[in-house]
Each structure stands twice: as C-alpha cells, then as structure tokens.
Amino acid sequence: MTEEFEIAGISTGAWWSSPTNTAAVFSGYSLPCSTEISPDVTNFGWQNFDNKINDHNDGCMNMHNSFFEGLLIDPNDQLLPDPWSKSTIPNAKSELLENFPFLDNMFLVDSEAESLLDHEIRNHKSSKEQITQDYKNLTSKRSEELEENSDEYSPRLLKRPRLETLSPLPSFKVRKEKLGDRITALQQLVSPFGKTDTASVLNEAVEYIKFLQEQVTVLSNPEQNTIGSVQQQQCSNKKSINTQGEVEEDECSPRRYVDLSSRGLCLMPISASYPVAAAAASAAEMNVHLVSGIFHSL
C-alpha cells in the first residue's frame, strides 16, 4: 500500500505520518481540519503526541493557503487554455461563417442598418440645424420690422393735431385770365356796331355800365320825377365825350328815353309796388261804386 502512495507522488512513509504530503495532494481543496483526530493517534502509541498535533495544524494552514492562492488569479494571465490561443480565433470565425452563410448575411444587414441609422442621424441633425437657423432668421426679421414700425409710428403719436382756424368767409378762387381774353370777352358783350379796337370796346363798356347805373337809380325812385334831369345829364355826358353833334342830338332826344325797357333791364323794388297796388285797388273800388250807382239809378 505504501508503494501505491509512492507512485501517486506522495513521499515514502506512512500516509498518516506526513501531513505536509497530504496537504500537497489536496492542494486547492477545502478539507476539514480539526484536532479531534488526537484520540485516534494516541492508539498507535506515539511518544511525541504534542509535536504531531502541531504538525497537523501546520498542514491544515498550508492547505488553506494553497486553496486561497488558487482563487487569486493574476489578471495578466491568459484565461484561455493553450489550445485556444488568440491566434486561432480569426480562423474559427472564418470557419464558422463558411459553415453558416446566413451569419454573414446577418452581419451585412447589421452593417447596412448601422450605416442607414448613421445617415438618418446626420439628416436629423442637419434638418434640426436648418430649422433653428430659419427660426433665428425669422425672429431677427420680425424684430427688425417691429423696430421699423415703432420708429415710423412713434412720431405720429407724439405730434399734436394742428387746429386750423376756419375763416368765416368762404374762400373764393380767383380765376387767372389774360388781358387779351378779357378784351375779347368785352368785345363779344358790347360790340353791336362791329367795333374791334380796344379803345372803342372799353368806351362802349363804360357807357353801358353808366347807363345801367342811371336806370337803376330812376327805377328805384319812381315817385320822383327825375327822368328829365337824368336824360339831360346823360346827354351832356355823351356830348362831352363824342364829337358828332347831330347823331348825339338824335340819340339824346327825349323821345328815345321815354321807354326805358327798350334800353336794358327795368328794375323795380318791392317797396315801390305797394302804393301802385293800393292805387289800383282804390281805382277798382271806385269803378265798382260807379257801376252800382248807375244800376240803382236805372
């Protein structure tokens, strides 16, 4: 039996007499260690009982230390065993893709989806930047328009409405005419004898105006017998202006000015019509009384 333990790599001697070799066999495993084996050991009749117990305790401590050393792994050590080294991983991947072609298609679809996703993200970013830029431009333009409107309308609000004093008389528009146009108009108005020179036209106009003034004066005073004096004054004025005596005497004859209505307007004020109407009424009453008296006498 001792030979079998020697072949297994345990040192010679009894297996119970070498606690260190037992710890080496069970290195990396948790074995229960206790001092309860001391009564069993005393049965063999060993002399150094205390030394054996100490050796056994030291072996248990060595076993625990070797177990914890097995748990503490160096991070720099390779996790893969020697047959599966890093150099063999690409070869295994290529063999896996050859055996399963759908995996290659899956990787291709994943790459295309990733590229499409990147493209969509770029488009989204660019569109977002464009929207923000447009919003900034719009806000700046709106602020400029508001500033322009405020500058445009602010003076108008500050200005007070000007109070215009209305003139009591209506404004008459003076018509601008040339002197030649006025003379032509006068020629058409007062040129019954075909006179076209300026002096004769002006004289005709002046005389016609004087005649109208005299007629208005005579008609406004019907009770006064001033017809003769007016005619004499008019004839004297005409004789002083003109040199043709015979013609003026004929024109200034009293027979010419008896009918004033033949020379122009016959104006009569309303106040002068009342005595005429009263006289006519009294004459009518007198005629009625006369007729009635005649009928009574018959």
Swiss-Prot record:
UniProt feature, compositional bias: Polar residues: 129-140
Tissues of expression: Differentiating root endodermis.
Primary residence: nucleus
Domain bHLH: 163-212
GO MF annotation list: DNA binding; DNA-binding transcription factor activity; protein dimerization activity
InterPro entries: bHLH95_bHLH, bHLH_dom, HLH_DNA-bd_sf, IND-like
One CC-aspect GO term: nucleus
Region (Disordered): 126-154
Pfam family for this entry, one: HLH
Record-linked Gene3D superfamilies: Helix-loop-helix DNA-binding domain (4.10.280.10)
Coiled coil: 117-149
Keyword annotations: Coiled coil, DNA-binding, Nucleus, Transcription, Transcription regulation
Compartment(s): Nucleus
Cross-referenced PANTHER family: TRANSCRIPTION FACTOR BHLH114 (PTHR16223:SF238), TRANSCRIPTION FACTOR BHLH83-RELATED (PTHR16223)
Subunit (UniProt): Homodimer.
Name of the protein described by the UniProt record: Transcription factor bHLH114
